[in-house]
Amino acid sequence: MSEEHLIRHCAPTLAGLKTGSLFSCSFACQQELLNVLRQMNHRLLPKGVRVLPLRLSDNRALIYVYRPKKLSSDIADTVAEQILLRHGYDTAVCEKCIVRLIQRIRSQEKFPHEIGLFLGYPPEDVCGFIENKACNCKCVGCWKVYGDEEAAKRKFAQYKKCTEVYRDRWATGTDIERLTVAG
């Protein structure tokens, strides 16, 4: 996992625009990957960003980059809380939700669709996705939209622009700590 992976897949999270981001990467040695994650957390935790492996298998890692404060706020939403409670989450503590998400990812063949709540997707869109089995959405961008289509399109454009700006700034030498907004 490289800084480039983080910039390419997580710029809106690093910028403080999004609760979390998820990406997959390959690794040759699990211990080396865990060392890189430790180093990245050492650099990003002071800015309020955490990096976790949700799953490691067959030299592939599913990496979750998130802002714990934003996640705590997001899961306090009434609709989000109802979705999580239905799937066995203890919503009182953010860290317990992360542990439950990891359990669900590692133990199920089907991907847990409530993960959208951990990525900052609107709860009505996550609920719509689950209830409609990923069909009948209003539009598709970073996620499938079932609620406010115009607000979602604005977010998609904002995330795209942020990623472009971050990629350009990183390519010209701005380090990841400088690109990560404290929060």
Predicted regions and their residues:
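Internal catalytic-core helix/loop-beta-alpha segment
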Residues: 86-113
